[in-house]
Regions:
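Feature activates predominantly on carbohydrate-active enzymes
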Residues: 1-147
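Catalytic-core regions of glycoside hydrolase
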Residues: 95-97, 110, 114-214
Length: 214
């Protein structure tokens, strides 16, 4: 409704530089491509990128539901998706004159769907790690760095953390497959989980990012 203009962005970037603040613009990649009944712009304009086109967001009835729909994802193996996604990433980082980019990538429930002609039967951890690596490699070519939320890299079963702040669909093994240059933002709703220590022990730079309770 009220998007920032390029002039607004340049003013923000200049203020950040003046006060030695590093700015990391963010858009949601892979997951969070919809919310409830609303499909977001990427999948509206490019419906062919949808990992689960057989699931109609208009039928969303709240959580839980028969389709397992929380948020839509794009298919990381679609041959045309990264041309579009990387153009958005480059436009954003160039506009903010920054070498940091946050890709979100949290709460990815739809990945490696059985009905996806490209992802069916693929290891979910490898799919997730592959997407993280593609984005990091793209940014690294420009001297830039990727930041992501860390929840999909935590085993929700063994930790007892559960499906929202950790992974219950086996993407957690991606932690040993992604580049160590990726900066992990370790978020949790309320409880002070000790997962930042886990990420640090795995060799990643990490920041704690509490949500409801600082």
């Amino acid at each position: 409704p009220n998007p920032l203009t390029l002039q607004d962005v340049k003013r923000i970037a200049a203020t950040c530089r003046k006060h030695n603040i590093r700015i990391a613009p963010q858009i949601n990649l892979l997951g969070h491509q919809s919310w409830a009944e609303t499909t977001y712009a990427l999948l509206r304009v490019y419906p062919e990128f949808d990992e689960t086109p057989h699931v109609d967001t208009k039928n969303y009835t709240g959580w839980p539901n028969a389709d397992g729909l929380y948020c839509k994802s794009y298919c990381p193996l679609h041959p045309d998706v990264h041309k579009i996604v990387f153009a958005l990433v480059d436009e954003l980082t160039d506009a903010f004159e920054t070498n940091l980019f946050h890709a979100g990538m949290d709460e990815v429930f739809y990945i490696g769907d059985d009905k996806c002609p490209r992802c069916n039967g693929r290891d979910k951890a490898e799919l997730y790690a592959g997407e993280v690596t593609k984005i990091q490699n793209h940014l690294a070519q420009q001297g830039k760095r990727l930041m992501i939320w860390g929840d999909r890299l935590i085993d929700g079963k063994t930790t007892g953390i559960g499906a929202w702040e950790a992974s219950m669909n086996n993407t957690y093994r991606a932690i040993d497959l992604i580049p160590k240059e990726v900066f992990i933002c370790d978020w949790h709703y309320e409880r002070p989980e000790q997962t930042a220590v886990y990420f640090a022990m795995k060799g990643f730079d990490v920041a704690t990012c509490p949500w409801r309770k600082p």
